[in-house]
């Protein structure tokens, strides 16, 4: 068996990626989230496939087909709630994975980091089009508001929005194409994830100390496969608790009402994992400015390798930058809270302050603190 896995053309790839892969001996549980994201992706594809067998992408029957899945399909309610809450677990793992990358300086592996940003954007696009499919009130109005933001693009904006809608409003054509996108994008994510792994295994993984670990590597199997299995068990436990005991806690009550173009909900908001970006969008009074800030709130991750002026790898030995990092995380939680609040005082003011802090922490405070740390080391 050992000779087969080392010599067989297909098994050799698996062997080099998951069995004999040289891995730093000191990587912590924060490194588990990559494998957890892979598990989340598989859960989403499998549950999504079974949902797609019963779902109809037609404005007159979409809402009823989701109700039919929950009421009449064997374990349809479980599949639907695993899929809906699986998306939340996916984004929790994704945010922690990115946060760990920033904290431990994984952005120096620029190819892996940039593919990761593409993965992040593709996952957000998949989640957005998926949220429209149940065709509830918040699905419809969320799709209308977010796609309408493209009209802020000069000259071609209005044409672009109508092209995406497939008409003059969000309707049957929009729902059909969003279903097509939602079906194909997870497979594109899978392809990008393999490229992400390919680039990672070219350079080797980072480690908590930020030091070169070439002299201290151990095989991935059995040490980290066991560690990953524990993480997967805890993830599945959390997902099952969420899906079985609190299935609707992260959803919106308005989505239990069928979509009605004549009745606007009092407060339109996306799913919780988009609220931080939505808060940044709303904090700028100008439409185009808001859209640009929304895009930059994600794309700003791409400038981390460029802003890396520190002589040390990661934040483990940099207490000043650590303070700024945790301020940034707290600020992100504030933005998430503000995104779910109505557009009125004091929420608008808090949102504007938090949005400024979000960009200031990354563009100014982190590089400045790194420069100070470099000068302290020289003393």
From Swiss-Prot:
Keywords: Electron transport, Heme, Iron, Membrane, Metal-binding, Mitochondrion, Mitochondrion inner membrane, Respiratory chain, Transmembrane, Transmembrane helix, Transport, Ubiquinone. The chain crosses the membrane at residues 33-53, 77-98, 113-133, 178-198, 226-246, 288-308, 320-340, 347-367. Its main location: mitochondrion. GO terms for cellular component: mitochondrial inner membrane; respiratory chain complex III. Its cofactor is heme b. Heme b b562 binds at residues 83, 182. It is a multi-pass membrane protein. It holds the Pfam family Cytochrome_B. InterPro entries: Cyt_b/b6_C, Cyt_b/b6_C_sf, Cyt_b/b6_N, Cytb/b6-like_sf, Cytochrome_b, Cytochrome_b_C_euk/bac, Cytochrome_b_N_euk/bac, Di-haem_cyt_TM. A ubiquinone binds at residue 201. Heme b b566 binds at residues 97, 196. It is found in: Mitochondrion inner membrane. Belongs to the cytochrome b family. The cytochrome bc1 complex contains 11 subunits: 3 respiratory subunits (MT-CYB, CYC1 and UQCRFS1), 2 core proteins (UQCRC1 and UQCRC2) and 6 low-molecular weight proteins (UQCRH/QCR6, UQCRB/QCR7, UQCRQ/QCR8, UQCR10/QCR9, UQCR11/QCR10 and a cleavage product of UQCRFS1). This cytochrome bc1 complex then forms a dimer. Heme 1 (or BL or b562) is low-potential and absorbs at about 562 nm, and heme 2 (or BH or b566) is high-potential and absorbs at about 566 nm. Component of the ubiquinol-cytochrome c reductase complex (complex III or cytochrome b-c1 complex) that is part of the mitochondrial respiratory chain. The b-c1 complex mediates electron transfer from ubiquinol to cytochrome c. Contributes to the generation of a proton gradient across the mitochondrial membrane that is then used for ATP synthesis. This is Cytochrome b. It comes from Akodon affinis. The gene is MT-CYB.
């Amino acid at each position: 068996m050992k000779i087969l896995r080392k010599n067989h053309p297909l098994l050799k790839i698996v062997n080099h990626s998951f069995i004999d892969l040289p891995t730093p001996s000191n990587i912590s549980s924060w490194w588990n989230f990559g494998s957890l994201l892979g598990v989340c992706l598989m859960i989403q594809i499998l549950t999504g496939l079974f949902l797609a067998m019963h779902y109809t992408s037609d404005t007159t029957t979409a809402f009823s087909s989701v109700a039919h899945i929950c009421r009449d399909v064997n374990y349809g309610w479980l599949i639907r709630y695993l899929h809906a809450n699986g998306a939340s677990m996916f984004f929790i793992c994704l945010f922690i994975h990115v946060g760990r990358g920033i904290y431990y300086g994984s952005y120096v592996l620029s190819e892996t980091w940039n593919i990761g940003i593409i993965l992040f954007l593709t996952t957000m696009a998949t989640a957005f089009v998926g949220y429209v499919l149940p065709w509830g009130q918040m699905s419809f109005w969320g799709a209308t508001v977010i796609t309408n933001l493209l009209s802020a693009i000069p000259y071609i904006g209005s044409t672009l929005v109508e092209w995406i809608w497939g008409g003059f409003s969000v309707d049957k054509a929009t729902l059909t194409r969003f279903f097509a996108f939602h079906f194909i994008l997870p497979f594109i994510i899978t392809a990008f994830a393999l490229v992400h792994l390919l680039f990672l295994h070219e350079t080797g993984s980072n480690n908590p100390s930020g030091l070169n670990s070439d002299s201290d590597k151990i095989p991935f199997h059995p040490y980290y496969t066991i560690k990953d299995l524990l993480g997967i068990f805890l993830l599945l436990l959390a997902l099952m608790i969420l899906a079985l005991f609190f299935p609707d806690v992260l959803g919106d009550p308005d989505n239990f009402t069928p979509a009605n173009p004549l009745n606007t909900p009092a407060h339109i908001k996306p799913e919780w994992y988009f609220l931080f970006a939505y808060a940044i969008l709303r904090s700028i009074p100008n439409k185009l400015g808001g859209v640009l800030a929304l895009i930059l709130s994600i794309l700003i991750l791409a400038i981390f390798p460029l802003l890396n002026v520190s002589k040390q790898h990661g934040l483990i030995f940099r207490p000043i930058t650590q303070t700024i990092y945790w301020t940034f995380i707290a600020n992100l939680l504030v933005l998430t809270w503000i995104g779910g609040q109505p557009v009125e005082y004091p929420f608008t003011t808090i949102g504007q302050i938090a949005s400024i802090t979000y960009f200031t922490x990354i563009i100014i405070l982190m590089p400045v603190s790194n420069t100070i740390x470099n000068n302290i080391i020289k003393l």
